[in-house]
Amino acid sequence: MSMEEKLNFQTSQDFSESILKPNNEKAIAETIKYCYKKNIPLEINGLGSKKNIGKNFQSQKTLDLSKYSGIIKYEPEELYIKVKSGTSIKAIKEELDKKNQQLAFEPNDFGSLFDGKSNEGTIGGVLSCNFAGPRRFKVGSARDHVLG
C-alpha cells in the first residue's frame, strides 16, 4: 500500500502523483512527518497566490490544501470566525459581508502583478507569510488578529 493510499489522499486526474490533496488534519500532519523523515522536499500550496514571489523552490511532492477548506464556525456577535487553512480569503470576506463585517487586516492581492485575476489566496497563506496590506500600520498584521 502506497503512502497516498494509506493516508486517504484524493489525487486529481489533472495532476501528477507528486501532488497530494489530503482532506483532513491527520493526513496533512502525517504527510509532513513522512516527507521530513524521508528528507523529501515538500511544497505546501493553497491557491498559489504567492507562488511567483521569491526564489523558485524545487520539490518532489506538493501538499495541495484546496480540499482542506471551509468555515468551521462563525459567531458574528462575538466577532469570531474559525476556518480551515485552505479557505480562500474571498470565501471568508463573502461570509463576513453577510453580517456587514470585514477583516481588520487587508490581505495583499498580487493577482494583478502576475495574471490580472484577483487572487488574495488562502488564510493559511496570508498567516504563514504575514502579509497584511496597507492597513498594517494602523491595525497591525494578520497574525495580530488570530487566536490560538
Named regions from a protein language model:
Residues N8-F9:
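Extended, low-complexity regulatory regions
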Residues G54, D115-G116:
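Short Asp/Glu-rich motifs
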Residues S12-Q13, N130:
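Short beta-strands and strand-loop turn motifs
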Residues F105-E106, G116-G148:
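FAD-binding subdomain of flavoenzyme oxidoreductases
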